[in-house]
Structure formats: C-alpha cells, structure tokens
C-alpha cells in the first residue's frame, strides 16, 4: 500500500531534466528543486548532446536548458529535444537576458526563458506553467 502511494505521488510530480555544463550550479539547482514536492529531478546533463540523449531516455516533462554548453549548445539541443521528445517543454535557463538570445530560444521551440538570477520562485512557477500544472 505504501509503495503504491509513493509511486502515485511520484507520478504526479513534474519530471525535470537539468542541462547545464556548470556542475556546481546544476547540483545546487537540483537541491533547490528537490525541496519542492511537486517536482522530481530525473537527471542532469553537462552538455547539449547528453541532454538530448537523457531526454529521449527519461522522457521529462520539462528540460531546464543552459544556452552556452560544449559539444552541442542549448539552442541546438532544444531543437533536437522538441523533435525527438515533442511532449517535453524546454525552459532556457541562462545568464543572458539579451533579446537576441530570447528570440533564438523561442525560435528553437523553448516554452520559457528564465535568467539565472531569477532562480527561486520564478523558476518553480515557470516549470509548473510549462508542464500545465
């Protein structure tokens, strides 16, 4: 009974994949998100290519995507995820608030754009909005 309840609770959580090449930032972000019972972090990727692979494998509801990453940047990774995992919503989470970066992210299929200085409440709200919850 308890395991069924725990599985049901986990199924109701928004499944989030973090894609950021700054390991300490990604770990801190995971720790912050893990304190919210509505969110379950399903993985972390250190580059865009790994993010695409993990998204295919883990089928997240939301991907938090940095733009400037090695191997494949966040814009390319967003396009690939939207193509291969169409139900996943991508929120670009980056240090840049330059209008051209916002435009590029939207054109790639991003559902949201949050700068890293807006982490706490804005990010949780953006995740829940993107997941339709």
Describe each region flagged by the PLM:
Residues 100, 118-131:
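C-terminal output helix
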Residues 58-64:
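Active-site beta3 strand of CheY-like receiver
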Residues 96-97:
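Short, conserved "switch-loop" micro-motifs in signal-transduction and mechanochemical regulators
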Residues 53, 75-87:
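Short amphipathic alpha-helix used as the core "switch/output" element in two-component signaling
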Residues 47-50, 72-76:
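Acidic catalytic/metal-coordinating carboxylates
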Residues 69:
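Receiver (REC) domain active-site loop signature in two-component systems and cognate sites
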């Amino acid at each position: 009974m308890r395991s069924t309840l725990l599985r049901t609770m986990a199924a109701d959580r928004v499944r989030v994949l973090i894609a950021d090449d700054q390991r300490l930032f990604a770990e801190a972000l995971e720790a912050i998100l893990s304190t919210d019972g509505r969110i379950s972090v399903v993985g972390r990727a250190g580059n865009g290519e790994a993010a695409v692979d993990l998204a295919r494998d883990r089928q997240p509801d939301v991907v938090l995507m940095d733009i400037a990453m090695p191997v494949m940047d966040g814009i390319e990774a967003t396009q690939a995820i939207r193509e291969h995992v169409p139900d996943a919503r991508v929120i670009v989470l980056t240090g840049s608030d330059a209008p051209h970066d916002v435009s590029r992210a939207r054109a790639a299929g991003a559902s949201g754009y949050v700068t890293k200085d807006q982490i706490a409440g804005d990010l949780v709200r953006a995740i829940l909005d993107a997941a339709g919850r």
